[in-house]
């Protein structure tokens, strides 16, 4: 049975785009990687919460737009348990809104870009060096084009 399960937790009811947009991004990334079964948890948090998480795990004491935590199977856990679990994503919608405004981008398009970026991190992509960054950015551009979204790395005019 094929299934993609996106668990969105938004306890404080932060403004987010229609969840269908996020599910469409999830399906697109999974399909691109020939994955038919997957699960991801997404927590929508305040700037203060993401700043605390960013400080604790990345040693950067400032809010950020998204943080991805790739699932690492604990030793001894049977292979079939959590076999399709990619990990957890934490998103700060206030940061995304500010970035979209500053970069003159459509807010829903920016959400989709950053969410795809976070999903790719869960699949092991990174941007630590220039080669990895170029590979990840090119894949993001390709996936976003399939959604009808312009290249986010080209500066938008105000």
Swiss-Prot record:
GO terms for biological process: rRNA processing. Gene3D superfamilies: Metalloproteases ('zincins'), catalytic domain (3.40.390.30). Zn(2+) binds at residues 117, 121, 127. The keyword Methyltransferase does not apply. InterPro entries: MetalPrtase_cat_dom_sf_prd, YbeY, YbeY_CS. Keywords: Cytoplasm, Endonuclease, Hydrolase, Metal-binding, Nuclease, Ribosome biogenesis, rRNA processing, Zinc. NCBIfam families: rRNA maturation RNase YbeY (TIGR00043). Belongs to the endoribonuclease YbeY family. This is Endoribonuclease YbeY. The gene is ybeY.
């Amino acid at each position: 049975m094929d299934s993609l399960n996106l668990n969105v937790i938004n306890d404080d009811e932060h403004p987010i785009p229609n969840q269908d947009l996020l599910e469409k991004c999830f399906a697109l990334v999974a399909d691109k990687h020939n994955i038919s079964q997957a699960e991801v948890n997404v927590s929508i948090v305040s700037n203060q919460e993401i700043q605390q998480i960013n400080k604790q795990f990345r040693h950067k004491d400032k809010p950020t737009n998204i943080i991805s935590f790739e699932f690492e199977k604990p030793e001894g856990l049977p292979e079939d348990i959590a076999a399709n679990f990619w990990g957890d994503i934490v998103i700060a919608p206030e940061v995304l809104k500010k970035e979209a405004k500053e970069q003159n981008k459509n807010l829903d398009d920016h959400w989709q870009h950053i969410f795809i970026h976070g999903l790719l991190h869960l699949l092991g992509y990174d941007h630590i060096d220039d080669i990895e960054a170029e590979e990840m950015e090119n894949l993001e551009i390709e996936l976003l084009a399939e959604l009808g979204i312009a290249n986010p790395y080209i500066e938008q005019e105000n």
